[in-house]
Regions:
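Outer-membrane beta-barrel translocator/channel fold
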Residues: 137-207, 256-272, 292-307, 315-372, ...
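Outer-membrane beta-barrel translocator/receptor signature
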Residues: 81-85, 92-101, 105-150, 161
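Repeated loop/turn-to-beta-strand initiation elements of outer-membrane beta-barrel proteins
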Residues: 124-127, 160-165, 209-216, 247-254, ...
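Outer membrane beta-barrel strand-and-loop segments of large Gram-negative receptors
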Residues: 348-352, 363, 374-427, 438-440, ...
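Residues that define the transmembrane beta-barrel architecture of outer-membrane proteins
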Residues: 95-97, 109-111, 144-150, 192-200, ...
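C-terminal beta-barrel architecture of Gram-negative outer-membrane proteins
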Residues: 430-437, 445-499
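Residues on the lipid-exposed face of transmembrane beta-strands in outer-membrane beta-barrel proteins
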Residues: 115-119, 129, 152-156, 200-206, ...
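Outer-membrane beta-barrel "beta-signal"
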Residues: 65, 69-72, 503-507, 526-539
Length: 539
C-alpha cells in the first residue's frame, strides 16, 4: 500500500476511553490516538496524545532509532475529529478496499456521515479526498455539537524523492450556556460558537539513498482558524527540515513557527519559536545512549534544552532499565487553545509558551511475546504551565493562567496480546502537583490519577469487540477565591463491529454505559448514556 494510505489508516485507528463518541465538548485526550508518520526510511515517529493536554507525556518505550518529531509543527495526521473515535479497526482496514462510506444514527439524536476515496491508478501518483460530518443535537440542556471536515490530499513519487500535499477545510460548533437564561440552577438557552479552520501542508523527502548519502525531509504548513463568538482569527505557520546520515546515526532538526491572533481585527497576541535540535546515538551489545541538545529562540529569548537517554538490558527480553532527561517548548495557538478548552474566554487572550524540563527513569520487559510491562517515574518542572479557572464575570467561561509548577508522575503500563485476536492494555497514571507560587493553590482542572483499560477481541475475523474503561480522579476549580471540586468518575464504552460481507460492515457503539453526567470542565456536564450505530460500505 502506498504510504499516504498508511497515514490515513493509522489516523483512523483509535481507542475510545468512554464518553467520546457523543461527547458534548472535546474531552481533551480521553481518546488516545497514535500516529505513525514515516519521516525517512528506518526512522519512525510515534506520537501519543496525552490523556490530559496539560500533562506532558514522555513517549513510552523509547527506541534509540526513533526520532520524535513534535506533533504540532508537523501535521499530516488527517484527523477530522479531534474528540470522537471512528469505529474502524486496524485489522479490518487491511481487509477493506481503499474507498469507504460510513453512515450512523444514534440516541440522543446524532448522525454521522463519512466518506473516503483514494486513487492509485498510477504507481507514482496518489490522490484522494476525505469528507466527514458529525452532528449531535443535544437540545438546550445538553448543548449541540457539530463537526465538518473536507480533506484533499495527494502524493507524487519521483525517482528518489516524494512530494506530499494536503489541504483541509472544516468547522466545529459548540455551545456556551447562557447565564442569563438559567432558572433555579437548571440549564437554559445556549450561545453558539463556530470555529472554522483551513489547513494546508506540504512535504518533500528522499526515500531512496546510498548508504553514505544525506537523507532529508523538508516540510511546511499554514493554519488559519476563527471563532465567531469573539470575532477572533488565528494564523500560524510552521516550516522545518530534518537532515540525517545513516553512518553517523545522528540527526539535525530545524523548525520555525509563528502564531498571530487577531481579536476584533486588531493584533492581540503574537508568538514565534525557532528551534535547532541535534543528537547523536551510541550503541553497544546490551546498551544504548542518546546525547542531544536543542537551541531555541522563544520571542527572541535564547534557550538551551538538553536531551539524554540511556538504556541497559539486564535480563534479555525480561528486564531493561532506562533513564532520560529532555526539555522542550510547548507553543500556543488559537485552534489548539480552543481544542484544549472550548469554553476559554478569548476576550482575555494571552499566548505564552510553556517550557518542559523532564527527568524520568524506569524499567520494562516482556514475557513470551504475550505479556509486557513498563514502570516509569518522572518529574516535569514546567514553566508557564497552562491552567484554566472559571471567570468571575461568567460562570460558564474560563480564564487562562500560566503558572510555574512541577508534576511528579508514576506510570504503570501492562499489556497482554494473544495472537492477533485479543489484546488488553492497562495503564495507571498517578500525579502529584507542586505549585511554585502561593498565588494558585491547585493545578486547576488537572486530575490526580487516571486509569485506562482497553480491550479488543477479534472473533474469527467476523465480529470485533472493543471494551474501554476510564477511571479519573477528582479535579479542582476556582471561582474568585472559592475552590470547587469536580468529582472523579468511571466511564465505560462498548463497540461492536460485525463484518457481514467483505464490502459491508454493521457497527454499534454504546458510550458512557453507566450514564454518569460528569464534569470535564466545571459547570459543563457531559452527555449520559448514548448509542450510535450504522453501516460501512467499502468498494
Amino acid at each position: 500500500m502506498n504510504k499516504i494510505k498508511n497515514y490515513i489508516g493509522l489516523a483512523m485507528i483509535s481507542l475510545s476511553f468512554g464518553q467520546i463518541q457523543a461527547q458534548e465538548e472535546p474531552v481533551n485526550g480521553l481518546d488516545t490516538v497514535r500516529f505513525s508518520n514515516n519521516i525517512i526510511p528506518e526512522v519512525t515517529d510515534a506520537v501519543k496524545i496525552p490523556f490530559h493536554p496539560q500533562l506532558h507525556n514522555v513517549t513510552d518505550s523509547i527506541k534509540i532509532e526513533e526520532y520524535h518529531v513534535p506533533k504540532y509543527p508537523f501535521k499530516f495526521e488527517y484527523l477530522p475529529k479531534k474528540f470522537k473515535p471512528l469505529a474502524f479497526k486496524k485489522s479490518r482496514e487491511k481487509a477493506l478496499n481503499t474507498n469507504l462510506i460510513k453512515l450512523g444514527l444514534g440516541v440522543p439524536l446524532v448522525y454521522d456521515i463519512e466518506a473516503y476515496y483514494s486513487s492509485d491508478r498510477s504507481k507514482d501518483l496518489v490522490f484522494g479526498a476525505y469528507v466527514d460530518h458529525y452532528h449531535l443535537n443535544g437540545g438546550t440542556a445538553n448543548r449541540s455539537v457539530r463537526t465538518s471536515d473536507i480533506s484533499l490530499f495527494g502524493k507524487k513519487i519521483f525517482n528518489k524523492d516524494i512530494i506530499e500535499a494536503n489541504i483541509s477545510f472544516g468547522n466545529y460548533l459548540h455551545e456556551f450556556i447562557d447565564p442569563d437564561s438559567l432558572v433555579a440552577g437548571r440549564f437554559g438557552s445556549t450561545i453558539p460558537n463556530v470555529q472554522n479552520h483551513v489547513r494546508a501542508a506540504g512535504r518533500i523527502y528522499n526515500y531512496k539513498y546510498e548508504e553514505d548519502e544525506i537523507r532529508y525531509d523538508l516540510y511546511g504548513n499554514l493554519n488559519y482558524s476563527t471563532s465567531s463568538m469573539y470575532n477572533a482569527n488565528g494564523i500560524n505557520g510552521h516550516g522545518g527540515a530534518i537532515v540525517s546520515n545513516q553512518l553517523g546515526t545522528g540527526m539535525l532538526f530545524i523548525d520555525l513557527s509563528n502564531e498571530l491572533i487577531l481579536l476584533n481585527n486588531e493584533s492581540s497576541s503574537l508568538t514565534n519559536i525557532t528551534t535547532l535540535k541535534t543528537y547523536y546515538d551510541l550503541e553497544g551489545k546490551d546498551w544504548k545512549v542518546r546525547l542531544g541538545i536543542m537551541a531555541a529562540l522563544d520571542q527572541n529569548a535564547p534557550l538551551i534544552l538538553p536531551e539524554f537517554y540511556s538504556e541497559k538490558i539486564l535480563v534479555e527480553k525480561y528486564l531493561t532499565t532506562y533513564s532520560g532527561w529532555k526539555g522542550n517548548i510547548e507553543g500556543r495557538d488559537l485552534e489548539r487553545m480552543l481544542f484544549i478548552n472550548p469554553y476559554w474566554d478569548i476576550a482575555s487572550v494571552e499566548l505564552t509558551n510553556s517550557y518542559n524540563n523532564i527527568k524520568y527513569a524506569g524499567f520494562k520487559g516482556a514475557h513470551d511475546s504475550k505479556l509486557s510491562y513498563d514502570v516509569r517515574f518522572e518529574r516535569n518542572d514546567v514553566k508557564n504551565n497552562l491552567l484554566f479557572v472559571t471567570s468571575e464575570d461568567s460562570m460558564h467561561k474560563f480564564e487562562s493562567l500560566y503558572e510555574d509548577m512541577s508534576v511528579t508522575s508514576s506510570i504503570l503500563s501492562l499489556g497482554y496480546q494473544l495472537n492477533d485476536k485479543f489484546n488488553s492494555v492497562l495503564e495507571n497514571r498517578f500525579y502529584l502537583y507542586n505549585m511554585a507560587s502561593s498565588t494558585e493553590t491547585q493545578a486547576w482542572h488537572m486530575p490526580n490519577y487516571a486509569i485506562t483499560w482497553l480491550n479488543h477481541y477479534n472473533i474469527q475475523d467476523l465480529i470485533e469487540v472493543d471494551l474501554s474503561i476510564l477511571f479519573q480522579g477528582e479535579t479542582y476549580n476556582r471561582v474568585g477565591d472559592t475552590e470547587y471540586i469536580n468529582d472523579g468518575f468511571v466511564d465505560a464504552s462498548l463497540g461492536i463491529d460485525y463484518h457481514y460481507h467483505k464490502n459491508l460492515s454493521i457497527y454499534l457503539d454504546i458510550n458512557n454505559i453507566l450514564g454518569t453526567r460528569y464534569n470535564i470542565w466545571y459547570n459543563y456536564p457531559t452527555v449520559g448514556l448514548n448509542v450510535i450505530g450504522g453501516v460501512k460500505f467499502s468498494f
